Amino acid sequence: MKLINIGFGNMVVSSRIVAIISPDSAPIKRFLSDAKTRNELIDATYGRKTRAVLVLDSGHIVLSALHPETIAARIEGGDKEEESS
């Protein structure tokens, strides 16, 4: 079980992440609104601007203040560390 830091000390299990997307498009905003009404939205931005939306295999949506590229690099970096050890 590999935990990935998504900002401000918040962690997500990397194997549970299905997608990391940018929140800027209208369909994603509707998707977030629907998740909020279903109580499946987790806001880990601490009041900062949402820069990445993480979709988990459980159907939950996690908002992060980090860029999608940063989170993806942390996941990739973690995989490389596991391979080398």
Swiss-Prot record:
TM region(s), chain numbering: none
A Pfam short name: RemA-like
Family of the protein in this entry: Belongs to the RemA family.
Listed PANTHER family: REGULATORY PROTEIN SSL2874-RELATED, REGULATORY PROTEIN TM_1690-RELATED
Protein name: Putative regulatory protein Dtur_1444
Taxon lineage: Bacteria, Pseudomonadati, Dictyoglomota, Dictyoglomia, Dictyoglomales
